[in-house]
A protein has these predicted regions:
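Catalytic core of pol beta-like nucleotidyltransferases
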Residues: 1-23, 31-37, 47-104
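Short beta-strand->loop micro-motif that forms the acidic, two-metal-ion catalytic signature
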Residues: 42-46
């Protein structure tokens, strides 16, 4: 599967698993364009609200399991993104700064 097909399949799987997601952002080396064959996919899923962040991250990673891809999924609510997204040095900060919206 090509990289663009893998990305499209992953975005589709995440969007189906999280139908209320406001945005899905690809970040990290794949978004910057400096990925190599060993690079994973890094996704930020922004939802309107998140009751159980850890549980939601696990659930969304499981949605990607059939694709057999190395991926990390961060989940934040829109309010958390607004409050914490400008905190330098955090994964959320870099996801927003370097990432590109792939859904929503």
């Amino acid at each position: 599967m090509t990289e663009s097909n893998m990305l499209a399949s992953a975005v589709q799987a995440l969007a189906q698993a999280a139908p209320l997601a406001e945005q899905i952002v690809l970040f990290g080396s794949r978004a910057r364009g400096d990925a190599d064959e060993n690079s994973d996919y890094d996704f930020l899923v922004i939802e309107s609200s998140v009751a159980n962040r850890a549980g939601e991250m696990v659930r969304l990673r499981r949605a990607l399991r059939p694709l057999r891809m190395a991926a990390d999924v961060l989940v934040y609510s829109r309010d958390e993104v607004t409050r914490w997204g400008q905190q330098p040095g955090t994964a959320l900060y870099w996801a927003l700064k370097e990432g590109r919206v792939v859904h929503g």
